[in-house]
Amino acid sequence: NSETGTNYGFDFPVVTVQDWVNSQKVLMDNLGINKWQFVVGGSLGGMQAFQWALDYPDYIDNAIIIAAAPKLTAQNIAFNEVARQAIMNDPDWCGGNYLMEDKMPKRGLALARMLGHITYLSDKSMAEKFGRDLKQEKIGFNFDVEFQIESYLRYQGEKFVNSFDANTYLLMTKALDYYDPVSDSEFIDKISSTTTKFLLISFTSDWRFPPSRSEEIVKTLISYNKSVSYACVKSDGGHDAFLMKNDNYFDVMRNFIENN
Protein backbone atom coordinates (compact mmCIF):
# COMPACT_ATOMS: atom_id res chain seq x y z
CA ASN A 1 0.00 0.00 0.00
CA SER A 2 1.73 3.18 -1.22
CA GLU A 3 -0.14 5.28 1.34
CA THR A 4 0.93 3.26 4.38
CA GLY A 5 4.15 1.69 3.15
CA THR A 6 2.97 -1.69 4.40
CA ASN A 7 1.61 -4.83 2.76
CA TYR A 8 -1.99 -4.61 1.68
CA GLY A 9 -4.33 -6.46 4.02
CA PHE A 10 -8.03 -5.97 4.53
CA ASP A 11 -7.57 -2.37 3.33
CA PHE A 12 -7.21 -3.51 -0.29
CA PRO A 13 -10.24 -2.10 -2.17
CA VAL A 14 -13.02 -4.44 -3.24
CA VAL A 15 -12.82 -4.96 -6.99
CA THR A 16 -15.33 -5.99 -9.64
CA VAL A 17 -15.27 -7.97 -12.86
CA GLN A 18 -15.49 -4.65 -14.69
CA ASP A 19 -12.39 -3.44 -12.83
CA TRP A 20 -10.48 -6.52 -13.98
CA VAL A 21 -11.54 -6.00 -17.58
CA ASN A 22 -10.50 -2.34 -17.40
CA SER A 23 -7.06 -3.36 -16.10
CA GLN A 24 -6.76 -5.92 -18.90
CA LYS A 25 -7.53 -3.16 -21.40
CA VAL A 26 -4.67 -1.09 -19.94
CA LEU A 27 -2.35 -4.09 -20.38
CA MET A 28 -3.62 -4.57 -23.93
CA ASP A 29 -2.79 -0.96 -24.77
CA ASN A 30 0.67 -1.19 -23.23
CA LEU A 31 1.40 -4.35 -25.21
CA GLY A 32 0.36 -2.59 -28.42
CA ILE A 33 -2.43 -5.06 -29.19
CA ASN A 34 -5.14 -3.49 -31.34
CA LYS A 35 -7.87 -6.11 -31.09
CA TRP A 36 -8.61 -9.52 -29.60
CA GLN A 37 -9.76 -12.05 -32.15
CA PHE A 38 -11.07 -14.26 -29.35
CA VAL A 39 -11.61 -13.74 -25.65
CA VAL A 40 -12.22 -17.09 -23.98
CA GLY A 41 -13.12 -17.73 -20.36
CA GLY A 42 -14.67 -20.34 -18.11
CA SER A 43 -16.74 -19.63 -14.99
CA LEU A 44 -15.55 -16.27 -13.62
CA GLY A 45 -13.43 -15.98 -16.76
CA GLY A 46 -16.60 -16.32 -18.82
CA MET A 47 -18.06 -13.34 -17.02
CA GLN A 48 -14.96 -11.36 -17.96
CA ALA A 49 -15.31 -12.42 -21.60
CA PHE A 50 -18.91 -11.18 -21.58
CA GLN A 51 -17.86 -7.91 -19.94
CA TRP A 52 -15.21 -7.36 -22.62
CA ALA A 53 -17.91 -7.52 -25.28
CA LEU A 54 -20.02 -5.01 -23.36
CA ASP A 55 -17.35 -2.49 -22.37
CA TYR A 56 -14.96 -2.68 -25.31
CA PRO A 57 -16.98 -3.87 -28.32
CA ASP A 58 -14.53 -2.34 -30.79
CA TYR A 59 -11.65 -4.39 -29.39
CA ILE A 60 -13.07 -7.92 -29.48
CA ASP A 61 -14.33 -9.95 -32.43
CA ASN A 62 -15.47 -13.13 -30.68
CA ALA A 63 -16.28 -14.16 -27.11
CA ILE A 64 -16.41 -17.76 -25.90
CA ILE A 65 -18.24 -17.90 -22.58
CA ILE A 66 -17.99 -21.27 -20.83
CA ALA A 67 -19.88 -22.55 -17.76
CA ALA A 68 -20.79 -19.03 -16.67
CA ALA A 69 -23.84 -17.07 -15.55
CA PRO A 70 -25.17 -13.52 -15.99
CA LYS A 71 -25.29 -13.18 -12.18
CA LEU A 72 -25.11 -15.41 -9.14
CA THR A 73 -28.15 -17.01 -7.56
CA ALA A 74 -28.85 -16.65 -3.84
CA GLN A 75 -27.51 -20.19 -3.36
CA ASN A 76 -24.21 -19.33 -5.00
CA ILE A 77 -23.85 -16.17 -2.93
CA ALA A 78 -24.56 -18.30 0.15
CA PHE A 79 -21.75 -20.72 -0.72
CA ASN A 80 -19.37 -17.78 -1.09
CA GLU A 81 -20.43 -16.28 2.23
CA VAL A 82 -19.80 -19.54 4.10
CA ALA A 83 -16.35 -19.71 2.49
CA ARG A 84 -15.60 -16.12 3.53
CA GLN A 85 -16.73 -16.76 7.09
CA ALA A 86 -14.48 -19.82 7.29
CA ILE A 87 -11.51 -17.60 6.44
CA MET A 88 -12.48 -14.58 8.52
CA ASN A 89 -13.18 -16.67 11.62
CA ASP A 90 -9.75 -18.27 11.52
CA PRO A 91 -7.79 -16.60 14.38
CA ASP A 92 -4.77 -16.40 12.09
CA TRP A 93 -6.66 -14.15 9.68
CA CYS A 94 -5.85 -11.29 12.09
CA GLY A 95 -8.50 -8.98 10.75
CA GLY A 96 -7.06 -9.41 7.27
CA ASN A 97 -3.58 -8.26 8.28
CA TYR A 98 -2.03 -11.70 8.67
CA LEU A 99 1.06 -10.86 6.60
CA MET A 100 2.10 -8.17 9.05
CA GLU A 101 1.64 -10.69 11.86
CA ASP A 102 3.65 -13.31 9.93
CA LYS A 103 0.69 -15.66 9.97
CA MET A 104 -1.60 -17.30 7.42
CA PRO A 105 -5.25 -18.39 7.95
CA LYS A 106 -4.57 -21.84 6.54
CA ARG A 107 -7.38 -23.62 8.37
CA GLY A 108 -10.03 -21.20 7.19
CA LEU A 109 -8.74 -21.07 3.63
CA ALA A 110 -8.57 -24.88 3.49
CA LEU A 111 -12.19 -25.13 4.65
CA ALA A 112 -13.25 -22.55 2.06
CA ARG A 113 -11.54 -24.57 -0.65
CA MET A 114 -13.10 -27.82 0.54
CA LEU A 115 -16.56 -26.27 0.39
CA GLY A 116 -15.92 -24.76 -3.02
CA HIS A 117 -14.52 -27.98 -4.41
CA ILE A 118 -17.68 -29.88 -3.49
CA THR A 119 -19.69 -27.46 -5.63
CA TYR A 120 -17.35 -27.94 -8.58
CA LEU A 121 -18.01 -31.69 -8.75
CA SER A 122 -21.17 -33.60 -9.63
CA ASP A 123 -22.82 -36.22 -7.45
CA LYS A 124 -22.22 -38.82 -10.16
CA SER A 125 -18.53 -38.03 -10.54
CA MET A 126 -18.03 -38.22 -6.77
CA ALA A 127 -19.91 -41.50 -6.59
CA GLU A 128 -17.86 -43.02 -9.40
CA LYS A 129 -14.51 -41.79 -8.10
CA PHE A 130 -15.03 -42.30 -4.36
CA GLY A 131 -18.39 -43.83 -3.51
CA ARG A 132 -18.26 -44.87 0.13
CA ASP A 133 -14.76 -46.31 -0.18
CA LEU A 134 -12.75 -46.38 3.03
CA LYS A 135 -9.08 -45.59 3.55
CA GLN A 136 -8.78 -48.59 5.87
CA GLU A 137 -10.46 -51.99 5.77
CA LYS A 138 -12.85 -51.25 8.64
CA ILE A 139 -14.72 -48.29 10.08
CA GLY A 140 -12.96 -46.95 13.15
CA PHE A 141 -15.97 -45.22 14.75
CA ASN A 142 -13.96 -42.09 15.42
CA PHE A 143 -13.36 -38.68 13.85
CA ASP A 144 -10.24 -39.55 11.90
CA VAL A 145 -10.28 -39.45 8.11
CA GLU A 146 -12.04 -42.69 7.17
CA PHE A 147 -13.69 -42.20 3.78
CA GLN A 148 -11.70 -41.61 0.62
CA ILE A 149 -13.76 -38.51 -0.17
CA GLU A 150 -12.76 -37.01 3.20
CA SER A 151 -9.11 -37.63 2.41
CA TYR A 152 -9.49 -36.10 -1.05
CA LEU A 153 -11.15 -32.92 0.23
CA ARG A 154 -8.53 -32.44 2.93
CA TYR A 155 -5.80 -32.89 0.34
CA GLN A 156 -7.41 -30.28 -1.90
CA GLY A 157 -7.66 -27.86 1.01
CA GLU A 158 -4.09 -28.39 2.18
CA LYS A 159 -2.71 -28.03 -1.35
CA PHE A 160 -4.68 -24.85 -1.99
CA VAL A 161 -3.35 -22.92 1.01
CA ASN A 162 0.17 -23.16 -0.37
CA SER A 163 -0.74 -21.53 -3.67
CA PHE A 164 -3.51 -19.00 -2.95
CA ASP A 165 -3.85 -15.91 -0.78
CA ALA A 166 -6.76 -15.74 1.67
CA ASN A 167 -7.66 -12.08 1.11
CA THR A 168 -7.52 -12.64 -2.64
CA TYR A 169 -10.05 -15.44 -2.18
CA LEU A 170 -12.34 -13.04 -0.31
CA LEU A 171 -12.04 -10.43 -3.07
CA MET A 172 -12.65 -13.00 -5.79
CA THR A 173 -15.86 -14.26 -4.20
CA LYS A 174 -17.12 -10.70 -3.76
CA ALA A 175 -16.44 -9.95 -7.43
CA LEU A 176 -18.54 -12.99 -8.28
CA ASP A 177 -21.35 -11.89 -5.96
CA TYR A 178 -21.48 -8.36 -7.35
CA TYR A 179 -21.45 -9.32 -11.03
CA ASP A 180 -24.76 -8.33 -12.62
CA PRO A 181 -24.23 -6.51 -15.93
CA VAL A 182 -27.94 -6.42 -16.77
CA SER A 183 -28.55 -4.13 -13.78
CA ASP A 184 -26.14 -1.57 -15.26
CA SER A 185 -28.09 1.50 -16.40
CA GLU A 186 -26.00 1.49 -19.59
CA PHE A 187 -26.55 -2.22 -20.34
CA ILE A 188 -29.04 -1.70 -23.18
CA ASP A 189 -26.74 0.77 -24.93
CA LYS A 190 -23.74 -1.50 -24.43
CA ILE A 191 -25.32 -4.70 -25.68
CA SER A 192 -27.00 -2.90 -28.56
CA SER A 193 -23.68 -1.53 -29.81
CA THR A 194 -21.57 -4.68 -29.57
CA THR A 195 -20.79 -6.52 -32.80
CA THR A 196 -19.06 -9.39 -31.01
CA LYS A 197 -19.96 -12.93 -32.05
CA PHE A 198 -20.69 -15.18 -29.09
CA LEU A 199 -20.34 -18.86 -28.29
CA LEU A 200 -21.90 -20.10 -25.05
CA ILE A 201 -21.03 -23.54 -23.68
CA SER A 202 -22.60 -25.28 -20.69
CA PHE A 203 -22.35 -28.78 -19.22
CA THR A 204 -25.19 -31.12 -18.33
CA SER A 205 -23.95 -31.98 -14.82
CA ASP A 206 -22.87 -28.48 -13.78
CA TRP A 207 -25.11 -27.54 -10.86
CA ARG A 208 -23.06 -24.52 -9.78
CA PHE A 209 -23.72 -22.76 -13.10
CA PRO A 210 -26.26 -25.07 -14.80
CA PRO A 211 -27.19 -24.91 -18.49
CA SER A 212 -30.19 -22.72 -17.68
CA ARG A 213 -27.83 -19.93 -16.61
CA SER A 214 -25.96 -19.95 -19.94
CA GLU A 215 -29.31 -20.06 -21.69
CA GLU A 216 -30.29 -16.83 -19.93
CA ILE A 217 -27.35 -15.11 -21.62
CA VAL A 218 -28.20 -16.74 -24.95
CA LYS A 219 -31.81 -15.55 -24.78
CA THR A 220 -30.71 -12.03 -23.88
CA LEU A 221 -28.31 -11.91 -26.82
CA ILE A 222 -30.96 -13.25 -29.19
CA SER A 223 -33.43 -10.63 -27.97
CA TYR A 224 -30.95 -7.97 -29.10
CA ASN A 225 -30.35 -9.72 -32.45
CA LYS A 226 -26.76 -10.65 -31.65
CA SER A 227 -24.81 -13.43 -33.34
CA VAL A 228 -24.77 -16.27 -30.81
CA SER A 229 -24.12 -20.01 -30.89
CA TYR A 230 -24.82 -22.35 -28.00
CA ALA A 231 -23.90 -25.90 -27.03
CA CYS A 232 -24.80 -27.90 -23.94
CA VAL A 233 -22.13 -30.59 -23.67
CA LYS A 234 -22.86 -33.92 -22.01
CA SER A 235 -20.46 -34.49 -19.13
CA ASP A 236 -20.46 -35.95 -15.62
CA GLY A 237 -17.67 -33.61 -14.52
CA GLY A 238 -19.86 -30.99 -12.83
CA HIS A 239 -18.70 -27.38 -12.95
CA ASP A 240 -15.10 -28.56 -13.35
CA ALA A 241 -16.06 -30.10 -16.70
CA PHE A 242 -14.85 -26.93 -18.42
CA LEU A 243 -11.33 -27.86 -17.27
CA MET A 244 -11.52 -31.48 -18.43
CA LYS A 245 -10.73 -33.21 -21.69
CA ASN A 246 -13.91 -33.80 -23.68
CA ASP A 247 -13.86 -34.33 -27.45
CA ASN A 248 -17.33 -32.87 -27.98
CA TYR A 249 -16.41 -29.80 -25.93
CA PHE A 250 -13.23 -29.25 -27.90
CA ASP A 251 -15.00 -29.84 -31.23
CA VAL A 252 -17.56 -27.13 -30.44
CA MET A 253 -14.82 -24.59 -29.73
CA ARG A 254 -12.68 -25.71 -32.67
CA ASN A 255 -15.57 -25.33 -35.13
CA PHE A 256 -16.44 -21.88 -33.82
CA ILE A 257 -12.82 -20.71 -34.01
CA GLU A 258 -12.28 -22.12 -37.50
CA ASN A 259 -15.43 -20.41 -38.79
CA ASN A 260 -14.62 -17.03 -37.26
Predicted regions and their residues:
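Gly/Pro-rich cap/lid or specificity-loop segments adjacent to the active site
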Residues: N1-M47, L54-E81, A241, N260
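Active-site nucleophile elbow and catalytic-triad environment of alpha/beta-hydrolase enzymes
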Residues: Y155-Q156, L171-K190
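Short beta-strand/loop motif that positions the catalytic acidic residue
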Residues: T194, L200-S202
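Short, conserved loop/helix-junction motifs that constitute active-site signature segments
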Residues: I191-T195, L221-Y224
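Alpha/beta-hydrolase-fold enzymes
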Residues: Y59, I65-K159
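Short alpha-helix in the alpha/beta-hydrolase fold that links the catalytic acid
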Residues: S183-F187, P210-T220
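Catalytic active-site module of serine/aspartate enzymes centered on a nucleophile-bearing elbow/loop
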Residues: E215-V218, I222-N260
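Acidic catalytic loop of the alpha/beta-hydrolase fold
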Residues: K159, L176-Y179, T204-F209
